Design a protein with these regions (language model features):
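Bacterial N-terminal signal peptides that target proteins for export
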Residues: 1-11
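A residue-level detector for conformationally permissive "hinge/kink" positions
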Residues: 9-10, 14, 215
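Hydrophobic h-region of N-terminal signal peptides that target proteins for export
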Residues: 13-23
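Short sequence/structural segments immediately N-terminal
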Residues: 22-443
């Protein structure tokens, strides 16, 4: 523990006791005296009126218990673009992965190598054109960038461009050259382990029509069991090893990042993911076999090998079905339309481009992601049903209208033979089923 003069400790205690709420005041005061003199000055001032609750939140954190205060995280070299002088100290309002990495070196290194850290690299993508150009910069700043991250710009004297800050996007590009934001998961200023481990934290970004992992998890047996038995999850434990510290259910953290008896915890969230389900046509990841074996080893803590292997067979079959039946043919048709001069290279300037975008970007992803996480309704009604509906009733007719004959190859494929009609025997079988089940024939 650092040593401070009795006078400083006494004054600090009286100050904090006068401004903090009841039972919290002695704790804040005592914890503050265990920090550096720079952090003590921060705490004394901020408790008087500038963000007092941030100080109280900090007082409940492990940082506070270890004597890690404001200055240790917010200090910044004078040459750093976003640094400014504040009561004689060089600081930044931004705490970046480089800042956290001073103590959490391995975690910061793993994170910088992860897909999360690259989430801000969407310049030139369709998503970026849609957000910045079609919708508009203000929408992109409050929408896309809040998850993907902004390129934070410095106006000078430590002031940050309001068009790019505040921002906690997971792939934020920081003035110090680092990428990402640790606090998007490890919320300020409690830095709570339990918050970071809860699926709701991941659901800040992983939800909605194009990446509904949070909703899929809630539907799955994993999510149902987690919610029912959350009191047994031991979420705030410093050690969190599957089978040792908890066993009743997995969270997002468990499968993608968590420690097991055979695997160390990692901050590279893609280390166990074998498919990239995001693009128009899903593709296997680099080193996908190794990644899959690591994920299987997590599954094996609860499931027999046949169950795990058969699940992956079903999952692969669903992804392959989407690729071969819908997404590859649709992409080929879009290429032919552009080559024939029927559509321009400009995104979103024709109805069929919106149809195609939603086909793979919304419905297609939902089907694939539902399959990956055991969410049957997202595979079926929110997924392949919507894919089929748009493909057959919107996309193919729109393409055929623009370039007659462009869909003929698709219709001849064995995947689409149903379009030629059912046999009399098939129709009769359906009629008999509906008559027996509902006492009425199908329309």
């Amino acid at each position: 523990m650092r040593q401070h003069s009795p006078t400083r400790r006494g004054l600090l205690f009286l100050l904090l006791a006068g401004v903090a709420s009841g039972q919290n005041a002695p704790d804040v005061a005592k914890l503050a005296t265990d920090t550096s003199k720079e952090s003590q000055a921060c705490i004394a001032c901020h408790m008087k009126g500038a963000t007092p609750l941030a100080v109280q939140q900090w007082s409940t954190s492990r940082h506070a218990q270890k004597g890690i205060g404001c200055f240790e995280c917010h200090q910044a070299d004078k040459g750093r673009p976003d640094a400014f002088e504040h009561f004689g100290e060089s600081i930044s309002v931004m705490v970046t992965p480089n800042s956290c990495g001073m103590c959490h070196g391995q975690e910061a290194q793993e994170f910088q190598a992860s897909h999360h850290a690259q989430a801000g690299q969407i310049l030139g993508s369709l998503d970026n054109v849609l957000g910045d150009d079609v919708e508009g910069p203000a929408a992109a700043a409050m929408g896309c960038a809040k998850c993907h991250g902004s390129v934070v710009k410095v106006l000078g004297q430590g002031k940050l461009d309001p068009g790019t800050w505040p921002n906690e996007g997971i792939g934020r590009i920081n003035p110090d050259g680092s990428k990402g934001s640790c606090s998007v998961c490890h919320s300020r200023h409690t830095f709570s382990l339990s918050i970071a481990r809860q699926p709701e934290s991941c659901g800040y970004c992983h939800l909605g029509p194009d990446h509904p992992q949070a909703e899929i998890y809630d539907e799955s047996k994993h999510g149902v069991t987690y919610r029912a038995l959350i009191g047994q999850m031991n979420l705030n434990s410093a050690s969190w090893v599957l089978g040792k510290d908890y066993s009743v259910a997995p969270t997002c953290d468990t499968c993608h990042m968590g420690a097991t008896s055979k695997l160390a915890a990692t901050h590279d969230v893609g280390a166990r993911i074998s498919w990239n389900l995001r693009p128009e046509v899903a593709i296997k990841q680099k080193d996908w076999e190794k990644k899959r074996e690591e994920m299987k080893s997590v599954c094996a803590n609860c499931h027999a090998s046949d169950w795990v292997n058969n699940f992956y067979t079903q999952f692969d079959n669903a992804v392959d079905l989407g690729n071969e039946k819908f997404f590859k043919p649709a992409k080929e048709i879009m290429t032919k339309l552009q080559q024939a001069g029927k559509i321009s290279p400009t995104p979103f300037d024709a109805p069929i481009k919106w149809t195609y975008f939603e086909l793979w970007h919304h419905q297609g992803r939902r089907a694939r992601m539902g399959a990956s996480m055991n969410g049957p309704d997202y595979v079926q009604w929110h997924g392949f049903y919507e894919v089929a509906k748009i493909f057959y009733s919107e996309f193919l007719p729109e393409a055929e209208h623009l370039l007659p004959g462009v869909t003929s190859g698709v219709k001849e494929s064995s995947y689409h033979q149903w379009m030629k009609g059912l046999s009399p025997e098939q129709r009769q079988k359906i009629r008999e089923y509906y008559q027996k089940r509902y006492e009425q024939p199908p329309s």
